[in-house]
């Protein structure tokens, strides 16, 4: 039996699950985009660094991978599943979140990027 396809969440479902604490948003965009605006409480893990930093990814919740527009997350979800992580992807990415008018925090508001060990 093949690996299940990515669980795509629309922004309303993602927001509800984030607020309930069932998801942790992992922002795959680069540092300038992350600093400029992101989903509140999200953790920065730029796509190019993700494989070398799996051990720093918090576990215990489903990881919601977020990119600019949802076009790059499927491959990252496959890599994360191979590491035994439970994952989902935000349909439409950060653009859809922003366009829906949902809360956004900036670097001065929230969490710093995930640091290298």
Question: What residues fall within each predicted segment?
Answer:
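Rhodanese-like catalytic fold shared by cysteine-dependent sulfurtransferases
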Residues: 1-24, 30-62, 67-117
């Amino acid at each position: 039996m093949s690996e299940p396809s990515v669980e795509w969440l629309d922004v309303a479902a993602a927001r509800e699950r984030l607020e309930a604490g069932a998801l942790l948003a992992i922002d795959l965009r680069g540092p300038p985009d992350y600093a400029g605006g992101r989903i509140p409480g999200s953790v920065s893990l730029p796509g190019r660094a993700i494989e070398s930093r799996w051990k720093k990814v918090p576990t215990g919740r489903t990881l919601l991978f977020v990119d600019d527009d949802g076009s790059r997350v499927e491959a990252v979800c496959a890599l994360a599943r191979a590491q035994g992580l439970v994952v989902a992807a935000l349909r439409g990415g950060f653009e859809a979140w922003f366009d829906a008018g949902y809360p956004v925090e900036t670097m001065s508001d929230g969490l710093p990027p995930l640091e290298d060990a």
